[in-house]
Amino acid sequence: MENAKWLRWMVVFLGIAGISYLLYMNLNRPEVAMEPEDEKMLADKNGLVGDGIADDTAALQAAINEVPPGGTLKLPDGIYKVSRNPDLKAVTGYGESHFALEITNPLTIEMDEVTIKTETDGRYGIFWIHDTADVHLKGGSLIGDKFPRDAELTSNIAVLLHETQNSTIENTYTKNHSQGIHLHDADNNLIRNVTSEYNYGSGIINFSSNNNIIDSCVVRNSSDGHLSLYGVGENNTVVNCVVTEDRPDHTIEQGITVESEKNSRIENNTVSGFYYGIDIKNGAESNIITSNNVFDNEYNIAIRPGDGGENLLTPSHDIVITNNFATNPRGNSHFGIFVDIGEGHVITGNTVNKGNLIITDPKMFAKYEKQNSYVD
């Protein structure tokens, strides 16, 4: 009798344990994301052509809109022509911009072997990513059909990250836009392995945005500060980038600009071919410029008031310039490191040519002259 009672309780106990386990596994089962191949089928369903001739704007937008939040859209290989959508107008503190496509939900777009092209004279960009987070663009070439000679700085932006957080743009190529990548009031984002060239304005610009990382990017043959931190952003990092200008008739361009920026870091970049290589100006404060290789610029590294005109000429303070190679400025220039304004700067551990450390404040020059290295 006792054995039978014991067996009944054991059966009840095992049943409860089994049900509890099943409930636990069901409640804690991870979400199953759609496979990229499923997303490819979704894209095909929307009638993507990808021959570079047909207008794929509506089909691309439909495919983007059908991706569930957090899902992945893998675009089939091809060349996608897009046109200006009159309903997509971004208004920022930098100006107005029109676009072909918009993204307003978290998603990933994989664009291996994909080219999206615009007609430059239409004055529009490609992706307007706004009021969202966790958007990831991977791969792809975003190309205007010709250099935008009659553009404005915001008329043809390849990708605008606008009030968007925690997003990434990786392994993407842009060419022939007014700006390549523009971050505007966009925080905690990553721009990595992006190449942007032949822009009317900046290849990459971080405007009034914080805590962003620009890593291992190439910006070439653009303008207006090829890679620009501007508009009172804070705690941004530019690292491992190559910024260069090699057009013989472009001698007044700026490389990396740090303008009205605070507590940001410019590290281990290579900058060459500019009038101002690394250009700190207009109220920049407490930024670190370290371990960069800056050469063949009229001014390799400069702390100066600004460009004049409509720009502010506010002094910059507490800039740390340390452990940089700022040798061989172009032509007969002797401006390896040029410090013309501000207080509280730290200038140590740099290598320049003899006579190429120019600090206009005599006391500051006397303090730091022997804390740097000189080569012939």
Regions found by a protein language model. Name each.
Residues 140, 167, 172, 189, ...:
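Consensus "Asn ladder" position of solenoid repeat domains
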Residues 27-39:
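Ser/Thr/Pro/Gly-rich low-complexity linker/stalk segments immediately outside membranes or between
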Residues 1-13:
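N-terminal Sec-pathway targeting helices
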Residues 60-69, 81-110, 116-138, 145-166, ...:
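Extracellular beta-strand-rich solenoid/capping regions of secreted or surface-exposed proteins
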Residues 43-76:
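Acidic Gly/Asp/Thr-rich repetitive segments characteristic of extracellular carbohydrate-active
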